[in-house]
Design a protein with these regions (language model features):
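Short beta-strand->alpha-helix linker/helix-N-cap micro-motif
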Residues: 22-121, 133
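Helix-start (N-cap) detector for alpha-helical repeat units in TPR-like alpha-solenoids
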Residues: 171, 204-205, 238-245, 278-279, ...
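Single-residue signature of alpha-solenoid repeat helices
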Residues: 190-193, 224, 263, 297, ...
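C-terminal/domain-edge helix-coil "capping" segments
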Residues: 1-22, 117-120, 131-214, 218-226, ...
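Residue-level recognition of tetratricopeptide repeat
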Residues: 179, 213, 252, 286, ...
Length: 430
């Protein structure tokens, strides 16, 4: 009975794992075949595949989208369970069932080949092979010389593998490539998104929304309105349920033109379309904050943070709203909560400093209470960080002898014009 129970438990466990595997829209990254010259230099087929997958996952992450995506995994990370005495495994069962049921599982393999007789660095080329329901697709990445114009080293190879990963996304999911280029401020994102719309890609609503967002940020509002309206139209025609993003983005575009009431109308429509979309509550809160309706704004930021507890900006604006209402304890609690989160808004400490100073606290005492926090911020301070944080860091450096006061003083002078222009832009936006 014990043996039978164990067998039943094993079968049930395998069935659960199998069901989960079949439900995943997964892409398996297989080994990349290499020429001997690279193997002799320490490269391996599996390691090369891992390197490519690392950049695939990085692009997917930096695209910062909630759109459904493929799940990428290395071949050697696939779950493999052998059935004793049966000569079969979970992987083989999964493959067979996918074939019978017509369930897609994309596999990516490839090779690096030599395009000249001596197999020089510049003339090696990666070619990816994608196996999916459409058949086999060959994706040439280009030679190392074409992409890099440099010898092989880790930094150059990272750029090459990023290029390879982008080309893979252009075939598998072009929206991710476009969003990644937009989020990382690289060229080519708009062109890819426009091509998706022209091709009537299934994600054309997402692409049109992205174009509208790009144009809004460039203050090209007429073009932005056009693309956001198309995104809304596409989502309706393509039956994309709960696609509130272009409506919310349209609302924020109106906000940036100081059309507060019209913006609020758009946000309310977006909330009806998708009441679980946290960004629309945050954007509505920003508009209410600019209208000095601080209590209503605070409620929106609170709702946004409840839906998305990792939203640093929601807690930050909750703190600012509470401070504007004179709710000192609540504001201090929210400032502290925001500071404890991993990604801190650059404006947090200057605003928190002003809040505490406004309560009558001594500036040196405030600095002392933040010594550890500001030390961490100082360590990661970038030259392009703007005036409010630089000013505060300069105060901290003067207060704390461990910090390099001349350095921050120099940073203030060097970036004064840039930071003042950025602050001017901040005044025209929330």
């Amino acid at each position: 009975m014990l043996i039978n129970g164990t067998v039943v438990a094993l079968i049930l466990a395998m069935m659960l794992v199998l069901i989960q595997d079949l439900r995943r829209d997964s892409v398996v990254m297989e080994a990349i075949t290499l020429p001997k010259v690279l193997i002799n230099r320490g490269f391996t087929p599996v390691g090369t595949s891992h390197w490519l997958n690392h950049h695939v996952l990085a692009i997917s992450d930096l695209a910062a989208t909630t759109k459904s995506q493929n799940s990428f995994q290395d071949q050697d990370s696939e779950i493999e369970i052998d059935v004793p005495g049966a000569g079969i495994s979970l992987r083989s069962i999964s493959k067979a069932l996918r074939a019978v049921l017509g369930i897609k599982q994309t596999r990516v393999a490839g090779e690096i080949i030599c395009t000249d007789d001596i197999c020089s660095d510049a003339n090696m080329e990666m070619r990816l092979r994608v196996y999916d329901k459409e058949g086999i697709k060959i994706i040439p990445v280009g030679t190392f010389g074409d992409v890099l114009a440099a010898n092989l080293n880790d930094d150059d190879l990272d750029l090459y593998f990023e290029t390879a990963a982008l080309k893979l996304f252009e075939y598998l999911d072009p929206y991710i490539a476009a969003a990644y280029l937009f989020q990382t401020k690289k060229s080519g994102g708009r062109e890819r998104a426009v091509n998706m719309v022209k091709a009537n890609h299934p994600d054309r609503a997402w692409a049109a929304n992205l174009i509208g967002l790009m144009d809004m940020r460039n203050e090209e509002f007429e073009s932005s309105d056009y693309w956001l309206e198309r995104a809304i139209e596409f989502s309706e025609n393509d039956d994309i349920a709960g696609f509130a993003r272009p409506i919310a983005t349209f609302g924020y575009s109106l906000h940036r033109r100081h059309l507060w009431d019209e913006a609020l109308e758009k946000y309310d429509i977006a909330i009806k379309v998708d009441p679980t979309y946290p960004n629309v509550y945050f954007l509505k809160g920003l508009t209410l904050f600019r209208m000095k309706k601080f209590l209503q704004a605070k409620n929106e930021f609170q709702t946004s943070s409840e839906i998305d507890p990792a939203s640093v900006r929601s807690f930050h604006m909750w703190a600012r709203s509470a401070a504007a209402l004179g709710s000192k304890k609540e504001a201090e609690k929210m400032f502290q909560k925001t500071a404890a989160m991993k990604q801190v808004d650059m404006q947090l400490y200057p605003q928190w400093y002003n809040f505490r100073e406004g309560l009558g606290e001594n500036g040196d005492d405030i600095m002392k209470s933040w010594e550890i926090n500001l030390g961490i911020v100082a360590k990661d301070l970038l030259p392009e960080e703007c005036m409010p944080l630089l000013v505060l860091m300069a105060r901290f450096a003067k207060f704390n002898q461990k910090c390099d006061w001349p350095y921050y003083q120099g940073e203030l002078l060097e970036h004064k014009e840039f930071c003042e222009s950025e602050m001017l832009n901040e005044k025209s936006a929330p």
